[in-house]
Structures are given as structure tokens and as C-alpha cells.
Amino acid sequence: MSHLTVSKILEDPFSALSLSEMLKILAALGWSTNYLAMAHRTHADRLPAIAVLPLCCDIAWEFTYAWIYPQASGHWQGVVRVWFFLHTAVLAATLRYAPNDWAGTPLGKSRARLVLLYVAVIGAFAAGQLCLALEMGGALGFHWGGALCQFLSSSGAVGQLLTRGHTRGASLVIWGARAISTAGGFVKLCIRFQHQVDGAPWLDSPMCWFYIGIVLSLDASYPVLYQLTRRHEEASGRGNSGKVKNR
């Protein structure tokens, strides 16, 4: 029962475990949409749609559990590899337009410095993900490493809105895909935990529930902050059409 298939869903579509499998498919499609939307928004606005830390942490986590500990990702194994390749596209777009985001800083004066920065941060997160897997085991490392990725994705998106003061590089499509995937993933984990199947070896941890609460709170706050920022843009006459020039 740990590896439900589409045929199994069709046989008993109203069971709790079938629902968890449907939510897994929803999360897989949702996160993929999120990454594609980030790449599109980055090219459209010529400004990175994701901050340094969440992007580098995501790539490091996906590399670790797609290629080094693939067995630890369980029923997510193939999906994690797809996400890794999608994130490389996001990284390529980000590196192309990163100088526009770092203008006025020492790093922003050299694309080579920015490339080295991203490589160094990815390497640091990869080392951390490996250490976490060695410390806690692959299964728990996969989930807690992914928890860090989700926290950084949600907090990084909110942070970009607050610090940039405009909505270029931001998108409600990116937020919606992330929020739906995250919420659906949490419900899926709860179902699998209650039925004692793989994919949820950590929900008895108070820290896990704190993490779930803070991520959901950040995702809930994003559209409010986005609309407030849009109103500020409209009031100041900037709007979202004022793209920066590619350097």
C-alpha cells in the first residue's frame, strides 16, 4: 500500500489513501507549475523571481535526493529528478538577470561574482543536506531538508515583496501554485501518517507542526502583501510595467 498507482486510485477513488495519492499528483504538478512560472516571470520582468537562499537550497535538496539518496525520496523519487531539471532552468534565468537585482552592490558589478556566489551557496546547502541525511537517516533527512526548502521559499517570497517595494519578479500564479502544493502536501502527509504508510515519519514532532503553521501563515500573508504593494505602485504611478534593462 506504500506505492499506490493511478489504477489503484481508479479502483477505490474515495479511500483516504487514494486521496493522498491524488494530492501527491496535485503537489507534483503544482510545484512544477511554480518553477515554470518563476522562469517565465524572471524572463518577462528581467528580474529574478526567487531569492538566492530558497533557490540554492531547493537545488541542493533535489540533487541530494535525486542522485545521492534516491531511495530516501520514496514515492517522490522520479518527481524530485524532474524538479531538479526544472530548477536548473530557473537558475539559468536567474543568473542571466541577477545583475539587475544586485545593482548598486559590489557583487552586482560582476556576473562572474554572482555565479560564484550561487555555486558557493548551492555547495553549502548540499553539504548541509548530506550532513542532515547522515545525522538523521535518509527518510527524516528528506523530509526535514524539504521543510527547510519550503520555509525558505515562502519566507523568501514575502521578503522580496517587503524589500523590493514593487511586484516585478513577483506573481500570484507563482504564489498560488506554491500555496496549493504546500497545503495539499501537508494533508497528504497527515493521511499517510494516520494510516502508517511511508512518506510521513515525522508528524509526531512538535517542531514539525510549528513548521507547518509558519509556512501556511507566510503563504496566507503573501497575497495580502502583494495587493498592498500593487496599490502602492499604482499610487506612485509605477505599475508593474516598468521593467529594468538587462545588463
From Swiss-Prot:
Membrane-spanning intervals of the chain: 49-69, 75-95, 114-134, 138-158, 171-191, 206-226
Keyword Transmembrane helix: yes
Subcellular location: Membrane
InterPro entries cross-referenced by the UniProt entry: PaxB-like (IPR039020)
Pfam families: Pyr4-TMTC
GO molecular-function terms, A-Z: lyase activity
Encoding gene, per UniProt annotation: ausL
Note: In A.calidoustus, the austinoid gene cluster lies on a contiguous DNA region, while clusters from E.nidulans and P.brasilianum are split in their respective genomes. Genetic rearrangements provoked variability among the clusters and E.nidulans produces the least number of austionoid derivatives with the end products austinol and dehydroaustinol, while P.brasilianum can produce until acetoxydehydroaustin, and A.calidoustus produces the highest number of identified derivatives.
Membrane topology: Multi-pass membrane protein
Protein name, per record: Terpene cyclase ausL
GO cellular component, one term: membrane
The enzyme's E.C. designation: 4.2.3.-
Task of the protein: Terpene cyclase; part of the gene cluster that mediates the biosynthesis of calidodehydroaustin, a fungal meroterpenoid. The first step of the pathway is the synthesis of 3,5-dimethylorsellinic acid by the polyketide synthase ausA. 3,5-dimethylorsellinic acid is then prenylated by the polyprenyl transferase ausN. Further epoxidation by the FAD-dependent monooxygenase ausM and cyclization by the probable terpene cyclase ausL lead to the formation of protoaustinoid A.
Family: Belongs to the paxB family.
Keyword Transit peptide in annotation: no
Enzyme class, spelled out: lyase
UniProt-listed GO biological process terms: terpenoid biosynthetic process
Pathway assignment: Secondary metabolite biosynthesis; terpenoid biosynthesis
Alphabetic keyword roster: Lyase, Membrane, Transmembrane, Transmembrane helix
